[in-house]
Structure formats: structure tokens, C-alpha cells
């Protein structure tokens, strides 16, 4: 089966060089991983500019090789399609993303396309500030707020109604007599810049990790499990659009709609402006490029929209973005500062990464003391020396990055950075894991304190078990305390064996949440030490008992989260989901052959090899054994074979195009829960192809191979009545 499937995939892209296919797969995986970190964790690890660069590289690759552009490609998806904490809800009208421009030439090219489409008609442009916040959709029925949801994948978002109700300026009821029967109102929730620094100061005071920027503060505050926490944060909202509108007519221009929104009591931006053409847009962009910090919220660009609603309909949309609107992204901000030192950190997979310590400097509204340098080759390429004055950019107003040195300011005291030959934490000689690797790694995975600390922090984090009160400080205390000499966590397997008695004696350094280094007493300069889990009377702190309760609750997390938490190389949230969905238990994954693993959608050869290598290590298998002994199921019982009939067992189904009543993931889940296998390519072995709007080449191939094709009504028949009934309503080449 594995060979057949791989052959099918290869046949579909025979004209594409293997190098291009491999590069496409790498880029797609990186982009999906970064989207997950951005939308689920509210903690991106790359800048907006770097993410945009990756996405553009993928788009350019697909332009050269259109066969690689599938509906599953990140270029065809609306960002944000991950939900973890809140109930999924569907938007009546889809929320799209925006296409981006980054310079005047690209902006002018967009204007030329609009002019070609609209000809000699009179039209105007509405300019808005692009708020760097969290996109939210408000639904009002007969003037009453009934739901607030995140954008999600554009069709399905997270229900955050209780939290949005805590934002004072969002009315529970629309003002005035003339309110529609149903209206969706789109906007951005943001955290005011003037309050952002105050919040981070309080978090630092409490020993909690501060937010990297105001956007993360808004997202993190809005996605709290307890609405009281949200209510304590000074969140605001700006509305900027209407989705579904029923029971109201007469709007001809978007700028009129904004007047209407304001009359209903909703917060609109005072900065919006209607202009006649490109020169007016350029003027607006230039003004706010120079005055961006005069605005109450962070901005990362300007949104330009065709103002006439009738013409918006004529211009239409692509699968992910309207053609009548464009986002102009400002260049990241840059400042000069001193490069004090280059240090190295060790990650959970042993990767050793240099990072810069700079003299504290304010950039893009926040103070920066550390910046990324990626690897030793990047340090060489940038040409920076320790002691240099360097140009620091907070790219996308998120992740600080060093661009290069100001070489003219060198005085001869600067020195080169030398990558250490040994792990800075355990002393093990560093090495590349395979020939050609740029990154050096510490191979001492079992005993390296840094790797264990980072793995435990990742396991407890939002992407995996999502254990409250368990951050990097707790992970450090449990894996490397000053007292007792034997840490309570020797490896991840000990997590569910923690008790109050094991926690109370622990003493550890008080760590700075930003740098991970011990804090020092401002008077004595000595490193601060604290009893982490006990109060002055030696009793457990309130958070200690809560931590143990949350650890116990984490035993029931879905299998995919445990797989992700094993820190297997190349296995992130997407691959973990694929493995859990296909094999449904940790034992089946361990027993699977490399070929069976590789043939799983979303896995592939490199991940399959890494999984087999991980399970070949004795102490890795011991982690799994300990978790089982502690009562962790390590299987997805909800999809087990013992839960009754699976009417679509043995079927292979391809889903393509846009369905009205299902998201792509929702359709896959509906099929997989009934036993069907969902694949990304059509072959003679495909049982059915389900098609929505804009199905693309897969529909053509299905007709060519005479594979039964189901529209959305036929798909419903398949789910409700089974394959025989679906075959009766399917389309085929003979028809």
C-alpha cells in the first residue's frame, strides 16, 4: 500500500524536479509550524517579515511549478486555522486574509490591476491603519450580541463571547432604532501601547514571563480560560468591516458602513480616510509611517480598500483574500545599539544557537536586551564582532534581529565570536548530526540539563499538555534545583509521579523570564534563591496545589499532544496529529514499520525515520512505560476500533475545493471518524472525490480516471447513508 501511494504522488508531479518538491515540503512544514506558534501560542519565534519571506518563497516556487499548488498548501489557506481552548463556531460569511505589498512598486501594480478591471468607472479608496491585534467577528441578532469569535481558518473560529463581553466599549445591544436582523461585524482587539509597559512591569514583578509585544498581550488576554483575567486587562477594539447583513439595505460605500457602525455604538477608527487615487494613498502611508507611535495601538501597515461596495463584488476574491483590498506593510524599525556579548543557548533537541546580548534599547515601543542570531554561519555572514555598534531591527515589531555592524565606529577593541566546541551546560563535545548540517547539537540528550529543562517546558506548554502554572521557571526548578541534589524530574517520565512531598524542599535560582538567567539582588549583586513551591511556613503555596491538580488533569489530553511532547526531531503539532489520527495509540506507532509511517499523510520519510530512531532508544521507551504506569492512556479511545461500526472503513477519499458546510479539517474529521482514509492525491485506488467550489485539477483527474465524484449533497449522503447510497448519486465521466 505504501508503495502504491507514493507512486501515485510521484505520478502527479513527475514534471517537478525532486529538489523543488523537497523544498516545497520543507517550506510548507515551516510555515504551518510558525502559524501554529503564532495563532495558538500567541508567541511567534520568527518575525512577521521572516514569515512573509517564507510564504513569498513558497508562492514563487508554486508559480514556477503550478503542480505543487494544492488546496492543502499554506498559500491557499487563511491564516489562523488552529483552535485549542474554545468551542469551534462557523462564521456565516467567511473571514478572509489580505494580500500584502511591501513597496511602492507592488502597490502601484495593484492599482494598475484595479484600473484594468474597472475601466473608466469612478471609484474611490478607503485607507485604514492595519491594527496589530487579534481579528474578531461579532455577531448581532436583532441588535443583541450573541457571539464573538476569532477568525480561525476564516470559516471556523473560536467562541470567545464571555471574554469579549468584558471589553467595555463593545455594546451588548446596538444603539438606535434601525438595526438589522442579523449582522456580522469584523474588527481587531488590541492592547493600548501606554498600558502594555505597565502590564509587563507587573508580570516581571510577579516573576511571570512578560509578553513580547502588545499584539501578544491582546491575544493572550483575550484567550484566557477565566474571563475575570480578561476583564482585568485594558483591551480595546476597532471595527472595520461587515460580513453577513440581513434586514438592512441602502449601503453603497464602505465608508458609509463605518458611519453606520459608529451610529450603532461600535468603536471605529478616527484615522480612516477616503482618497481618490494612488497619490492620496501614498500620502496616507507616508504620514502614518512617520507618526505610527502617535496612535494608541501598534500598527504594522495600512489597508487600502475599494470604497464602492458594488465594485467590490465585481472584483471578487481569491481562495484566501479579496481582490478589492490590499495591505501595505511598513518596513521594520531599526536602531543602533552596542553588541555586549554573543552567548549560546541549548534547545530541547540539543541544537546550540547563538544569541546576542545588547545594551538595552527601545525599539518599536518596547525595550530589547537580546536578539536572535540563528547559527554560527549567520554570525559570520552578518560580519558582527563582540563590542560592535550594531543595527537592531525589531522585524514586524515582534522578534529583535541584528542586521549588521556599523563598521565605521569600530575602535579595535572588538573581537570575533567563536562557537564553543563543547556544550555550555554539560560539557559534551558538540557535533553536526549529519554531514552538511549547519547547526551544531549536543548529543547528550538524556543527561544535558538544558535539553531536559527545555523538553519539560515544551511538554507542559500550550502546544502539548497545556499545564497551567508550569512555565520555564518551574521546569528549571524541577530539573535542576540547587536543593535537593537529586532533582524530582530525571526525565519526562517522572512528570506524573510528582507529589507535594517532592516539591516542598526544592530551592532554585529566581530566573529572569526573558533571558532565563538568575536575577540578582540590586543591592548585593548576589543571585536570588527562593523556595519555589513552599511558603515561609513550609506549607505548599496555593499555586503548588493547583499545579499538581493540573498535572493530573493533563493525563487525559489527546494522544497527539503527547506525541508532540516527546520532542522527536521533525515531529511538530501537524505531524503529531497525523500519527495520532492514523495509528490511534502510542503502541501502534512504535510497532509500525518505517514504510507504514512514511505512507501516512502529513508524515513522510524523514519523520518516519526519526520516529523509528526515537523508539529504538531504551530510555525513550522507558518514558512511555512510566507514563502508562502513572495512568496515562496514550491512545485516542474516541477513534478506537472498539467503538462500534465504522461505515466507511476501507474507503480512500479525496476532498478538494471549498465546501459550504464543512471546513477542510471538518470534512476530514467526519470521514476519518467513520473509518475512511483521507488522502491528498487522486489515483485509481481512490473511492470517492468530494468537490466544492473551485476544485482545481483533482476534479479533472477524477473524471479522467472515472473515480466517482460527490458534490456537497452527495458528501452528506456518503456520511449519512454509506458508500452504496453515495455511489447512486455520484457524478462520473460517462455523465
UniProtKB/Swiss-Prot annotation:
What this protein is called in its record is DNA ligase 1
Question: Tell me, which GO biological process terms does this entry list?
Answer: DNA repair; DNA replication
GO CC, sorted alphabetically, is: cytosol
Identify its protein family: Belongs to the NAD-dependent DNA ligase family. LigA subfamily.
Cofactor(s) recorded in Swiss-Prot or TrEMBL: Mg(2+); Mn(2+)
Provenance organism = Streptomyces coelicolor (strain ATCC BAA-471 / A3(2) / M145)
User: Which PANTHER family would you find in this protein's record?
Assistant: CHROMOSOME TRANSMISSION FIDELITY FACTOR 18 (PTHR23389), DNA LIGASE (PTHR23389:SF9)
What does it do?
DNA ligase that catalyzes the formation of phosphodiester linkages between 5'-phosphoryl and 3'-hydroxyl groups in double-stranded DNA using NAD as a coenzyme and as the energy source for the reaction. It is essential for DNA replication and repair of damaged DNA.
**The organism's taxonomic lineage, starting at the top:** Bacteria, Bacillati, Actinomycetota, Actinomycetes, Kitasatosporales
Answer yes or no on keyword tRNA processing. Answer: no
Amino acid at each position: 500500500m505504501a508503495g502504491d501511494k507514493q507512486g501515485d504522488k510521484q505520478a502527479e508531479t513527475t514534471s517537478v524536479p525532486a529538489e523543488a518538491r523537497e523544498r516545497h515540503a520543507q517550506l510548507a512544514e515551516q510555515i504551518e509550524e510558525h502559524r501554529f506558534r503564532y495563532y495558538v501560542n500567541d508567541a511567534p519565534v520568527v518575525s512577521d517579515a521572516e514569515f512573509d519571506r517564507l510564504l513569498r518563497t513558497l508562492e514563487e516556487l508554486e508559480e514556477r511549478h503550478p503542480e505543487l499548488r494544492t488546496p492543502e498548501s499554506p498559500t491557499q489557506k487563511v491564516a489562523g486555522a488552529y483552535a485549542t481552548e474554545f468551542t469551534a463556531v462557523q462564521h456565516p460569511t467567511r473571514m478572509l486574509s489580505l494580500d500584502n505589498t511591501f513597496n511602492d512598486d507592488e502597490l502601484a501594480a495593484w492599482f494598475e490591476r484595479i484600473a484594468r478591471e474597472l475601466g473608466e468607472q469612478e471609484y474611490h479608496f478607503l485607507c485604514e491603519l492595519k491594527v496589530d491585534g487579534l481579528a474578531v467577528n461579532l455577531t448581532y441578532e436583532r441588535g443583541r450580541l450573541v457571539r464573538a469569535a476569532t477568525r480561525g481558518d476564516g470559516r471556523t473560529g473560536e467562541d470567545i463571547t464571555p471574554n469579549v463581553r468584558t471589553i467595555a466599549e463593545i455594546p451588548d445591544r446596538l444603539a438606535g432604532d434601525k438595526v438589522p436582523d442579523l449582522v456580522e461585524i469584523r474588527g481587531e482587539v488590541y492592547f493600548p501601547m501606554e498600558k502594555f509597559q505597565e502590564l509587563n512591569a507587573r508580570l516581571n514583578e510577579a516573576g511571570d514571563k512578560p509578553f513580547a509585544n502588545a499584539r501578544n498581550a491582546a491575544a493572550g488576554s483575550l484567550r484566557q480560560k477565566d474571563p475575570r483575567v480578561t476583564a482585568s486587562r485594558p483591551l480595546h477594539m476597532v471595527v472595520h468591516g461587515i460580513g453577513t447583513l440581513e434586514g438592512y439595505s441602502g449601503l453603497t460605500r464602505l465608508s458609509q458602513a463605518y458611519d453606520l457602525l459608529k451610529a450603532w455604538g461600535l468603536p471605529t477608527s478616527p484615522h480612516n480616510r477616503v482618497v481618490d487615487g494612488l497619490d492620496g494613498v501614498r500620502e496616507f502611508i507616508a504620514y502614518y509611517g512617520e507618526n505610527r507611535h502617535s496612535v494608541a495601538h501598534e500598527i504594522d501597515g495600512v489597508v487600502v480598500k475599494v470604497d464602492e461596495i458594488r465594485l467590490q463584488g465585481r472584483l471578487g476574491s481569491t481562495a484566501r483574500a479579496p481582490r478589492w483590498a490590499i495591505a501595505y506593510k511598513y518596513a521594520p524599525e531599526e536602531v543602533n545599539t552596542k553588541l555586549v556579548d554573543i552567548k549560546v543557548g541549548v534547545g530541547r533537541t540539543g541544537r546550540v544557537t547563538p544569541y546576542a546580548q545588547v545594551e538595552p534599547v527601545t525599539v518599536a515601543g518596547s525595550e530589547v536586551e537580546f536578539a536572535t542570531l540563528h547559527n554560527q554561519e549567520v554570525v559570520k555572514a552578518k560580519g558582527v564582532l563582540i563590542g560592535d555598534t550594531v543595527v537592531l531591527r525589531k522585524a514586524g515589531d515582534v522578534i529583535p534581529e541584528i542586521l549588521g555592524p556599523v563598521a565605521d565606529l569600530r575602535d579595535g577593541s572588538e573581537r570575533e565570536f567563536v562557537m564553543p566546541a563543547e556544550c555550555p551546560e554539560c560539557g559534551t563535545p558538540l557535533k553536526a548530526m549529519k554531514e552538511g548540517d549547519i547547526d551544531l547539537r549536543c548529543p547528550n540528550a538524556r543527561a544535558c540539563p538544558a535539553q531536559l529543562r527545555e523538553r519539560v517546558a515544551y511538554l507542559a506548554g500550550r502546544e502539548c499538555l497545556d499545564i497551567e502554572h508550569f512555565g520555564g521557571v518551574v521546569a528549571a526548578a524541577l530539573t535542576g534545583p540547587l536543593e535537593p541534589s537529586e532533582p524530582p524530574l530525571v526525565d519526562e517520565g517522572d512528570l506524573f509521579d510528582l507529589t507535594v512531598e517532592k516539591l516542598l524542599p526544592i530551592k532554585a535560582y529566581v530566573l529572569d523570564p526573558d533571558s532565563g538567567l538568575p536575577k540578582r539582588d540590586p543591592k548585593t549583586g548576589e543571585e536570588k534563591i527562593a523556595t519555589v513551591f513552599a511558603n515561609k511556613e513550609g506549607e505548599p503555596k496555593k499555586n503548588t496545589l493547583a499545579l499538581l491538580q493540573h498535572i493530573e488533569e493533563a493525563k487525559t489530553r489527546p494522544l497527539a499532544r503527547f506525541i508532540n511532547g516527546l520532542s522527536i526531531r521533525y515531529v511538530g503539532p501537524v505531524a503529531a496529529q497525523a500519527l495520532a489520527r492514523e495509528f490511534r495509540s502510542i503502541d501502534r506507532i512504535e510497532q509500525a514499520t518505517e514504510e507504514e509511517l512514511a505512507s501516512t499523510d502529513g508524515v513522510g520519510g524523514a519523520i518516519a525515520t526519526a520516529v523509528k530512531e526515537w523508539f529504538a532508544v531504551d530510555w525513550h521507551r522507558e518514558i512511555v512505560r512510566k507514563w502508562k504506569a502513572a495512568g496515562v492512556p496514550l491512545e485516542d479511545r474516541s477513534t478506537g476500533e472498539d467503538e462500534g461500526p465504522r461505515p466507511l472503513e476501507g474507503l480512500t477519499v479525496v476532498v478538494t475545493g471549498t465546501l459550504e458546510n464543512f471546513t477542510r479539517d471538518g470534512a476530514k474529521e467526519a470521514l476519518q471518524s467513520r473509518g475512511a482514509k483521507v488522502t491528498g492525491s487522486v489515483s485509481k485506488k481512490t473511492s470517492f472525490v468530494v468537490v466544492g467550489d473551485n476544485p482545481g485539477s483533482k476534479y479533472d483527474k477524477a473524471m479522467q480516471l472515472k473515480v466517482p465524484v460527490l458534490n456537497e449533497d452527495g458528501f452528506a449522503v456518503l456520511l449519512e447513508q454509506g458508500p452504496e447510497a453515495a455511489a447512486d448519486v455520484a457524478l462520473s465521466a460517462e455523465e
